[in-house]
Structure formats: C-alpha cells, structure tokens
A protein has these predicted regions:
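Short, well-formed alpha-helical segments that are part of the catalytic scaffolds
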Residues: 33-48
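A conserved acidic beta->alpha catalytic loop
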Residues: 59-67, 112-113
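Glycine-rich, basic loop-to-helix element that forms the pyrophosphate-binding segment
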Residues: 81-98
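Short beta-strand-to-loop acidic/aromatic patch adjacent to the donor-nucleotide binding site
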Residues: 102-113
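Conserved donor NDP-sugar-binding/catalytic core segment of glycosyltransferases
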Residues: 117-149
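Short, flexible, basic/aromatic active-site loop/helix in glycosyltransferases
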Residues: 154-175
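Acidic donor-binding loop at a coil-to-helix junction in glycosyltransferase catalytic cores
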Residues: 202-208
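Non-catalytic, C-terminal membrane-associated alpha-helical segments of glycosyltransferases
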Residues: 241-247, 251, 258-289
Length: 289
C-alpha cells in the first residue's frame, strides 16, 4: 500500500496484520522541452499514486513550459545546463541528491506516461531483497507506428519474471535487459555497484544491470507496472540508434562476453569498427529500445 512517500508491505499471520517492510521512494525525471506528452505524464504521475513532494525533476534548460509544468504540480526541481546532461551522470545526480531520502529511486523519462498502479506495482519488486533493479512494461503510445509497436511487443511481454546469473543460458543478454524509460533501483545496491557510467552514449541501464547480476543480484521485470512509451523514429533516426547500440556493445564487450546474445545466441558480428546486426528483432533483444 502507498502512504505519504512510502510503500508498506504487510502479511496476515494468525488473523493479524504484521508490518513487514516500509520503503521510501523518489520518482526522478530528466526533462528537456517535454511538450504535451510531458504534461500528460506529469498529470498521471500524480493521478496514479505519487505525491508531488516525492517527484524530482532535473531539467536541462528547457525553452518551453516543461519546468513550469513540474512546478505547477509541486514537484521538486533542479535546473542544469543542457551541455551538462548525460544519460548516466544526470541520473546519478538525481540519486546523489536524494540518497538520504529514499530506499528506491524510480526513473521515468518525460515521454513515458504512467498507467494506473505503476508505482506500487514496481515497488513490490523490492520485497525480494536480492532485487537490485526493476523495470516496468512499456505499451506503445496511441499514435505509434508499426515499427514502434513491434519494438514494444517484442521486448515487453505480458508475463513478468526475475532474472539472475543462472538465467543467462536460456535468456542470454536479455538477462540484463532493462529500460530507464520506466525503471527502479534499490539505493543501497546502487551505491554498492557504483551507479551508472557517465561515459556511455546510451544503455547506462543495461550496464548497471549487468554489473548487478554479476555481483549476485537480480533484475525484475514487472509486467503489471505499466507506462506508455514509444518513438516514431524516421529511418535515419532508426539507423543512428542501431549504430549507437553497436558502438555501445563494442565499447562494453564484457557484457556480451558474460551473457552472450539474445536467448543465449551470439548474434552480433564484428566488421572493422562497426557492429552488424543480424536482424532488427535480434537487435531489439540487446536491450536498448
């Protein structure tokens, strides 16, 4: 149950309610020119269970009303220069600035629109003390094109699971799939692992998940915790994203070496400084969509 910035777990023993655990949360959202979709996201964050004082927005110099939207909902805000934004580093800053106020940090992107129950259902993953991070199901936006819908269907099924090092033979690199568009991290483990890298161009979430699993922790996929999130990329944008994913896996080759390819298959081939992907569906399995 939710109560004033915490989730409370309880059990019924001999007909009596026994409090089991109390966990404090902060929802952190990096923003930049969020527009109409951010307005809807901010509205739903509050409508579906979060309290405004436990939402923390880091804005990278928006020129529109993004910051005003955050303030109008009573969110805490921090403004940084756009040149200082970094996918990993900015999220690390959100954790550092709330490290004494939360047991779990929930990350949303400005274009992820939470759905009913998103908060308590992703927090429930941390009832297992071995879970280091969790991520929710992403359904496509109502205006998503076929490729965007495919990506969400392929990566975000209706059945949740928990993965650990023992999962790699069957799941391969999907063992450490996660997405910071809608994710949550146990603060104590986040500190222990060292947080996100600040040097990667993307996939700071998979990087952390891989480190955590290799350290003996688990990753939870919470299929009943839902947000709407997708991108209608142009062909050029799709190419750039896939190229960047290839660069990431070349730079962080230890992840593939530890976990293999999708479903345990080795599906990436090296050619000079580029990585060629066998097919888009296989690439989606590498966890950056």
């Amino acid at each position: 149950m939710l109560l004033h910035g915490v989730t409370i777990s309880f059990a019924v023993i001999s007909g009596e309610f026994i409090w089991v655990d109390i966990m404090r949360y902060i929802i952190a959202v990096p923003t930049y020119n969020g527009g109409a979709v951010w307005r809807e996201s901010a509205k739903n964050i509050i409508a579906f269970g979060a309290e405004s004082q436990f939402v923390y927005v880091i804005d990278s110099g928006s020129k529109d009303d993004t910051l005003n939207v955050a303030k109008s909902h009573g969110f805490k805000t921090l403004s940084i220069e756009s040149k200082d934004f970094n996918h990993g580093g900015t999220r690390n800053l959100a954790v550092e600035n709330n490290i004494d106020n939360a047991d779990v940090i929930i990350f949303l992107t400005q274009d992820a629109i939470p759905q009913p129950g998103f908060l308590e259902k992703i927090m429930a993953a941390f009832d297992d003390p071995a879970v280091a991070c969790a991520y929710g199901r992403q359904l496509p936006h109502v205006d998503a094109n076929p490729l965007a819908r495919h990506a969400r269907t392929f990566n975000y099924g209706a059945t949740g699971y928990v993965s650990d090092m023992g999962s790699k033979d069957t799941m391969g690199i999907k063992t450490v799939f996660t997405s910071n568009s809608f994710s949550a991290y146990r603060v104590s483990t986040f500190k222990e692992i060292g947080g996100f890298p600040s040097s990667t161009i993307l996939a700071e979430d998979m990087y952390f998940a891989a480190k955590a699993v290799m350290a003996g922790y688990k990753v939870a996929y919470c299929a009943d915790a839902v947000a709407r999130h997708s991108h209608n990329y142009s062909p050029a944008e799709e190419f750039k994203r896939y190229f960047d994913i290839g660069v990431f896996h070349q730079d962080e080759a230890w992840i593939r070496q530890a976990f293999g390819g999708a479903g345990g298959r080795k599906e990436i081939y090296s050619f000079g400084t580029e990585l060629l992907i066998k097919k888009c569906a296989a690439l989606d399995s590498y966890g950056m969509y």
